[in-house]
Amino acid sequence: MADEKNYERRIVIDPKVHFGKPCIADTRIPVENVLELIQENISFTDIVEKYYPDLEIEDIKACARYATDIVRSEEIHAELT
């Protein structure tokens, strides 16, 4: 994926917008809202056409990449039993 880090231009964190939750740039749409739609198995095309017509498919992909990077960088402290 050559554009893997391109979400950095599409996902922004602004303390004045949604209490600093990550949002899609130039919108007030939280990444969390888009991820919930993905979780409901709604296609990227339907998310753009039916829910957020101001977005592009690349914005939806950026949300998924952002979430993947957050999980990838998370430290897990599991206890072995």
Give short role names for the model-derived ranges.
Residues P30-T81:
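Long, charge-rich, low-complexity alpha-helical segments
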Residues N6-D46:
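A short, structured beta-strand/loop element
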Residues M1-Y7, E79-T81:
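Intrinsically disordered, low-complexity and often Lys/Arg-enriched segments
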